From Swiss-Prot:
It is found in: Cell inner membrane. PROSITE patterns: ATPASE_DELTA. This is ATP synthase subunit delta. Pfam families: OSCP. Coiled coil: none annotated. The keyword Repeat does not apply.
Length: 220
């Protein structure tokens, strides 16, 4: 008997009935920039699901719309404690996962491709991996376009001016092709963090306090 993940994800997705489409505006914060994986690297469960969704959206000619919804859903997960707890709930059976995920996707107004894809994820009891799968889709897209993926974390949502200034500073540092993801993190207290690969740029108040505490311990 094949396991829950031994399936052609693209063919399974295509058998689901379509639903209505819509967009969700995303406003997130906190900066982490990570080097994208090699395009040819498809190891791991999340990467396989990510590739299936990316290829399906490309074949159907609505990749741009799907990527926008992927970013919006990833942002919603990052910003909602309740949503993260729901996705991580191992007690939920397949029927419950499918029902609640359908309600969630309808409420957020996503299109049929992403909605059916999340349905497959729920059917296979892989909702705890959803955030990683969405990250994989965005990383794959950035890799194909020769970009570096930047995840931004800040205590407050970035303004358009702050976002433009950050992109300019990253370009000055040699990162001219950067795709940013943004998340809010109140624990930073103020400022932001930016990670590029193994390099962390930390201007947050929390980071400054930590460095001060470490310096005081070293001087003791």
């Amino acid at each position: 008997m094949p396991g829950p993940d031994s399936f052609d994800a693209r063919s399974r997705i295509s058998r689901f009935r379509p639903h209505s489409a819509a967009d969700l505006v995303r406003r997130n914060t906190r900066v982490t920039v990570t080097q994208v994986p090699q395009v040819g690297h498809t190891g791991g469960l999340a990467q396989r699901y990510a590739r299936a969704l990316y290829d399906l959206a490309s074949e159907q000619g609505n990749l741009s719309d799907v990527l926008g919804e992927v970013k919006a859903l990833r942002a919603a997960i990052a910003e909602s404690d309740d949503l993260r707890k729901f996705l991580a709930d191992a007690r939920m059976d397949i029927r419950q996962g499918r029902t609640v995920s359908n309600v969630l996707m309808s409420k957020l107004g996503f299109g049929d491709v992403l909605r059916r894809f999340v349905g497959v994820i729920a059917d296979n009891r892989r909702l705890p991996d959803l955030a990683s799968i969405l990250d994989g889709v965005l990383a794959l897209d950035s890799a194909l376009r020769g970009e570096v993926v930047a995840e931004v974390r800040s205590a407050q949502p970035l303004t358009d001016t702050q976002r433009s200034q950050l992109q300019a500073r990253l370009a000055e540092a040699g990162y001219s092709r950067v795709s940013m993801t943004e998340r809010t993190d109140a624990a930073l207290l103020g400022g932001m963090t930016v990670r590029i690969g193994s390099t962390l740029f930390d201007t947050s108040i929390a980071g400054r306090l930590t460095r001060l505490q470490n310096a005081m311990k070293g001087a003791a």
